[in-house]
């Protein structure tokens, strides 16, 4: 997206930034040479160019997009709401997260009986509080610049969620990470209250105070947001849904969460597989049970949909005795 000097000034005045088609709000000023030098001194290799490109756009801020991470077959909704920066009011600021990683690296070296040179191989740059973190590999070699995702495991009582700390390689570089950001629901639809993009949309609304130039820029930014909406309906209408993994998963999830048996039938006829994993390791049956869509759950069982080991626990708050007994028998 090409921006005029006047538009860049408006973005700066409203603490907004655009990076690889995504809008950052509460955006911080570009990184200084002094900060780059201080960061580089503690790393095992050079700061990857894509991360520098992001930081030269904004050295921190907030994001309002959906991101899914596949942890060895467990589909996890990853909270990527923060781009860490110095002196932020988050759980830790950037320096705090770097010090946290240094402490962990030193402890690991001591436990393994080896020396550590004090240089980080992986630099934390974003995530959400203490629950999710994104790192970029700074160690020289074929993985230099790759983005790594880490998520904190939750107690077993959180049925269907990650129960152990998990890590995976997510993207080749920071630009690749930003290309994964999307909206699973239309953020402009008033029925999608409390959505992931609510604060982002409020930040765009503030542009209207700048008069016609601000309204025009807001419109351009909204176009960028609309390009990230994952709408499965056109693909269902034109017959291409089965060939679009992310769209068909969202379609199945919405049908299951709404308990829409007619739509489930249409999706099956369109080539969607009821055995496909949608969230965690669960599929359409677990999505129905989690929302208490018991009629749809019974229908799925009638179609031969397999029961997972945690299906009963996922639906425990909604199940009646007959359906619980049926699940136990399968």
Language model features with spans:
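A surface-exposed partner-binding patch
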Residues: 1-132, 280
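Ankyrin-repeat-protein effector appendages
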Residues: 318-330
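Long, contiguous interaction/recruitment modules in multidomain scaffold/adaptor proteins
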Residues: 128, 138-221, 225-226
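Ankyrin-repeat boundary/"N-cap" motif
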Residues: 242-254, 276-287, 308-317
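Ankyrin-repeat C-terminal turn/loop position
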Residues: 272, 305-306
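Intrinsically disordered, low-complexity regulatory segments in ankyrin-centric signaling systems
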Residues: 200-265
């Amino acid at each position: 997206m090409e921006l005029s000097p006047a538009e860049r000034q408006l973005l700066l005045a409203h603490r907004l930034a655009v990076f690889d088609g995504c809008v950052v709000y509460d955006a911080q000023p570009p990184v200084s040479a002094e900060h780059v030098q201080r960061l580089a001194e503690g790393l095992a290799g050079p700061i990857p160019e894509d991360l520098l490109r992001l930081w030269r756009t904004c050295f921190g801020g907030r994001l309002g997009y959906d991101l899914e991470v596949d942890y060895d077959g467990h589909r996890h909704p990853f909270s990527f709401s923060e781009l860490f920066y110095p002196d932020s009011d988050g759980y830790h600021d950037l320096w705090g997260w770097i010090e946290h990683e240094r402490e962990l690296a030193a402890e690991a070296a001591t436990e393994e009986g080896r020396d550590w040179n004090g240089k980080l191989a992986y630099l934390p740059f974003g995530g959400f509080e203490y629950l999710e973190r994104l790192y970029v590999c700074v160690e020289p070699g074929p993985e230099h610049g790759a983005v790594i995702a880490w998520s904190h495991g939750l107690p077993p009582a959180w049925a269907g969620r990650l129960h152990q700390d998990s890590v995976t390689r997510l993207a080749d570089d920071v630009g690749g990470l930003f290309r994964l950001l999307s909206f699973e629901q239309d953020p402009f639809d008033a029925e999608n209250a409390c959505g992931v993009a609510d604060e982002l949309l409020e930040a765009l609304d503030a542009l209207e105070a700048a008069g016609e130039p601000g309204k025009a820029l807001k419109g351009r930014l909204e176009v960028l947001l609309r390009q990230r909406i994952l709408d499965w309906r056109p693909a269902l209408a034109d017959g291409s849904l089965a060939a679009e993994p992310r769209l068909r998963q969202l379609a199945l999830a919405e049908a299951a969460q709404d308990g829409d048996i007619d739509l489930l039938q249409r999706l099956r006829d369109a080539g969607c597989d009821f055995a496909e994993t949608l969230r965690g390791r669960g599929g359409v049956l677990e999505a129905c049970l989690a929302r208490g869509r018991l009629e749809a759950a019974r229908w799925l069982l009638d179609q031969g949909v397999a029961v997972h080991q945690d299906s009963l626990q996922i639906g425990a708050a909604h199940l009646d005795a007959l359906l619980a007994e049926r699940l136990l028998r399968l």
